[in-house]
Amino acid sequence: MTESRRNFLKFIVAGSVAAGCPINLSLLGAESPTRPRVDGEHFEICHQVRDGKSFAKPPVSKRYDVVIVGGGVSGLSAAYFLRGHDFLLLEKEPQWGGNAYLEEYEGQAFATGSAFDEKGTASEQLAREIGLTLLPINSKDPSIIAGKWVPDTWRSGLDQLPYPASVRESFKKFRAEILALDPDKNVQQLDNEPLSKYLKGYAPEIKQWWDAYGPSNWGANSEDTSAYVAAGELQYITAEEDTRVTLPGGNGALSRQLASTLQPKYAERMISDATIVAVDQQQTEVRVTYVHEGELRTIAAKYVVMATPKFIASRLIPAIPDAQREAMLSYRYCPYPVINMIFDKPVYNRAYDTWCPGNTFTDFIVADWVLHAQPGYVQKNNILTFYTPLSEVQRRELLRVESCQKIAENVLGDFQKLQPEFASAQPVEIRMYRRGHPMFLPTPGTFTEVIPAATQPLERIVFANTDSVGPESEVSGAVEAAHHAAEWVEKKMAGTTTASVARTASAVSA
């Protein structure tokens, strides 16, 4: 990209990079070469929590039935399920939604992370309950490989791959072997084996494809992916029916609808920009200390729902047993920037999600795809969302705006090289939303060993979030975890017998 083009293009960076901390940075193109202007918050408080600093805790200022920590889909869902109680919802970011957060350009919504759901899931059912109708995607995923557009990659597309016949045959043999594994009957075995074990002996092009698909969907390459997850996924993408549903903005549409449903009646019980520094379980209550508007505050609750990733919960709650804390700290999380490119003319509308192995990005989606089938719809801007997961060692690159801009430039450059018709594509704006720890990696053993050990409720604290359910990070898991946590709280508050609460606890960690 030329320097003049770089300065003309509007480039915006936002998102959360530090562990458990908000950061909002923006870089706007100027008419002359100038140093990028960076605005954002400092990380001192969050880094002090990470490093084990103890904060002076003010006296309890107010008491609630339940405090929910984390305002992503899981926390918002828990608040919705527990809305009949005196709850308080705390969120570290200035907005609600967590990984499921949408942004808009001239009234057009697009996803900054979590992109779609499936028919019949807990999250899709919740969406319908609160008045949101998700639309069918009905688009089998193509791939662009060596300049060729290959439709329905893992079904009819295998015969169209731009590879020698021996490589295409290798794809077919791999598909047959994995589909024969029957993951439902071999959960323990397959979850403790890496996908890479099953790739041995096959054409390297198969590994290249999965090393794009895995990082995009669950943050891990084939060496770090449970074979159980991959086997289930291949069944899913080779099925006859496309069960995916979404709206422009992805699952951010659900989080926005949840927040809009709750705020008219419960706005005073929903506090954003609140950085939690301690969650102290006492004999009769839990005390939660947080920083809001520059002040430390402590409130208390009978019970707490921790709708945060486990690496955050493990640092905030002293009462967690050592073995459970060790399990929590064994989770691994991927750094993940998502780049939206806004074009003022049609560039690509051939499919919803297109895979591009071997590039800076893994795949890209058409933001308004599901609206194309709606009567009378006319696309104003062609917004393409590029998924650009990084390796864990690259996380620090997201802390510098210059590095983020370079990533975005590489994504645009790779896109322009995919096919001749993309060569002249120039966006009017690029928006990058970066997250340092959005998804846990489904490494071998995480689903069957780590999650059960890490998610056991304490006496007054229960754990939600997608990493309480597994086997991978999905919006349905966020809602399932919230529902189980809400049931646990309800039974605790009702004084249900220990055995009954234990059964609910088992569901939470299932």
How does the language model describe each region?
Residues S32-S54, D353-W355, T360, V366-A510:
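Conserved flavin/dinucleotide-binding core of flavoenzymes
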Residues E124, R128-E129, T133-T225:
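Mobile amphipathic helical/loop "lid" adjacent to a hydrophobic cofactor/ligand pocket
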Residues T2-Y64:
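Extreme N-terminal leader/targeting segments of oxidoreductases
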Residues R83-E103:
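Glycine-rich FAD pyrophosphate-binding loop
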Residues V66-L88:
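N-terminal Rossmann-like FAD-binding beta1-loop-alpha1 element of flavoenzymes
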Residues V60, S272-L384, L418:
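Mid-domain catalytic core of redox enzymes
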Residues P183-A278, E285-R287:
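Active-site/ligand-binding neighborhood in enzyme catalytic cores
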Residues G98-G120, E177-D184:
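Glycine-rich active-site loop/strand segments that organize a redox cofactor
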